[in-house]
From Swiss-Prot:
Protein name: Ribulose bisphosphate carboxylase large chain
Entry keyword set: Acetylation, Calvin cycle, Carbon dioxide fixation, Chloroplast, Disulfide bond, Lyase, Magnesium, Metal-binding, Methylation, Monooxygenase, Oxidoreductase, Photorespiration, Photosynthesis, Plastid
Organism: Oedogonium cardiacum (Filamentous green alga)
Family label: Belongs to the RuBisCO large chain family. Type I subfamily.
Localization annotation: Plastid, Chloroplast
Residues annotated with N6-carboxylysine modification: 201
Length: 475
């Protein structure tokens, strides 16, 4: 006869489906300095109270599950659980709320963006009670920020390495992005650097394809860098994309770049992953390489207003994982980026202490406790007429990257680079003299055209080019 089993009511624990509000919605909770804080934009399913949704987000991204389990009694849930401590409606939106969740520090592995994201933006985003969920911001406490090494070098060390001060840096993505042979690619790099740019760049999808294997590209680009340096007397660089299918292959490419003596390499941090990115950042720090970060795939994650992760969170994550440059949008070019929102996360990349400012989308005061800053990269559909706005918006600590705005010059690559260099220096000088670039920028560019035929030709080509589309990511 088979043994009989019996579950007795009241013995051990009370089984059943949980009402999350009873455990995880705690409006009286006093936030600790060591808590990781998250602001979620929630859209509940019809009929689901926002308090239940906020509590469910806190539960499913920390210690909770859908039912009571007997092993809850083996630990202290009050110590480890996430808590939804505040909920506020989103102005002007129907059935949308900002839920504030506090997570105790012990839930997360030290120095691991991968673990942080696995918890906070993991399975909870598929929760049925929610129609949509977006992580708008994170507050990284000083105690957790200090477990990360951050960027390999940071803005000031980069300037010292390059011996370039008092102006923004200039870059150019080599086009066409795919199809050039390694030798022709190196030729384009040389022409741009000789013309006056500080950097040129591999496009994000240039890895090691049949038309141009990575080692060939590295060798021809290194030759171009050294030739341009010898002719101009300036330190030059090219973002050699080390992104690869495995971490081992990625690091092999980084080692080759180091042996060639080039100053900077590149990684696609979202497609490559945070574990790979942190490993590459550590290598760059140990071996004196700067690390340029491209954000390919970001719009899949951050462009929808109601669901996903805002780019300011991805930018914070990159600062912790490690990178000296990060693409940040332009405000004025062809790619998405509203001015106040963009300036908000640019400050989160560069500054050491950033005050809460909801007008710029910053939900929490952030203290990076001396973690090195990341230089923003403005790239995408920009040309010489945009230079006054770019200098006014980004200031000096930014890399302004003109791809088509260099290579599309009617006289060739080197004149295109010269036009951008003249425009940058003219705008920087005008700003330093106290002129208002927002109002007088066009006059500054036109005046510079009188002594730079390269700039005059560029201004004529791009005088009618505009990208007039409504931005999606608004406050």
């Amino acid at each position: 006869m088979a043994p009989q089993t019996e579950t007795r009511a009241g013995a051990g624990f009370k089984a059943g489906v949980k009402d999350y509000r009873l455990t995880y919605y705690t409006p009286d909770y006093i936030v600790k300095d060591t808590d990781i804080l998250a602001a979620f934009r929630m859209t509940p399913q019809p009929g689901v109270p926002p308090e239940e949704c906020g509590a469910a987000v806190a539960a499913e991204s920390s210690t909770g599950t859908w039912t009571t389990v007997w092993t809850d009694g083996l630990t202290s849930l009050d110590r480890y659980k996430g808590r939804c401590y505040d909920i506020e409606p989103v102005p002007g939106e129907e059935n949308q709320y900002i839920a504030y969740v506090a997570y105790p520090l012990d839930l997360f592995e030290e120095g691991s963006v991968t673990n942080l994201f696995t918890s906070i933006v993991g399975n909870v985003f598929g929760f049925k009670a929610l129609r949509a969920l977006r992580l708008e911001d994170l507050r990284i406490p000083a105690a957790y920020a200090k477990t990360f090494q951050g960027p390999p070098h940071g803005i000031q060390v980069e300037r010292d390495k390059l011996n370039k001060y008092g102006r923004g840096l200039l870059g150019c993505t080599i086009k066409p992005k795919l199809g050039l042979s390694a030798k022709n690619y190196g030729r384009a790099v040389y022409e741009c650097l000789r013309g006056g740019l500080d950097f040129t760049k591999d496009d994000e999808n240039v890895n090691s394809q049949p038309f141009m294997r990575w080692r060939d590209r590295f060798l021809f680009v290194a030759e171009a860098i050294y030739k341009a340096q010898s002719e101009t007397g300036e330190i030059k660089g090219h973002y050699l994309n080390a992104t690869a299918g495995t971490c081992e292959e990625m690091l092999k490419r980084a080692v080759c770049a180091k042996e060639l003596g080039v100053p900077i390499i590149m990684h696609d941090y979202l497609t490559g992953g945070f574990t790979a990115n942190t490993s590459l950042s550590n290598y760059c720090r140990d071996h004196g390489l700067l690390l340029h970060i491209h954000r390919a795939m970001h719009a899949v994650i951050d462009r929808q207003r109601n669901h996903g992760i805002h780019f300011r969170v991805l930018a914070k994550a990159l600062r912790m994982s490690g990178g000296d440059h990060l693409h940040s949008g332009t405000v004025v070019g062809k790619l998405e980026g509203e001015r106040e929102v963009t300036l908000g996360f640019v400050d989160l990349m560069r500054d050491d202490y950033i005050e809460k400012d909801r007008s710029r989308g910053i939900y929490f005061t952030q203290d990076w406790v001396s973690l090195p800053g990341v230089m923003p990269v403005a790239s995408g559909g920009i040309h010489v007429w945009h230079m006054p706005a770019l200098v006014e918006i980004f200031g000096d600590d930014a890399c302004l990257q003109f791809g088509g705005g260099t290579l599309g010059h009617p006289w060739g690559n080197a004149p295109g680079a010269a036009a951008n260099r003249v425009a940058l220096e003219a705008c920087t000088q005008a700003r330093n003299e106290g002129r208002d670039l927002a109002r007088e920028g066009g006059d500054v560019i036109r005046a510079a055209c009188k002594w730079s035929p390269e700039l005059a030709a560029a201004c004529e080509v791009w005088k009618e080019i505009k990208f007039e589309f409504e931005t999606i990511d608004k406050l």
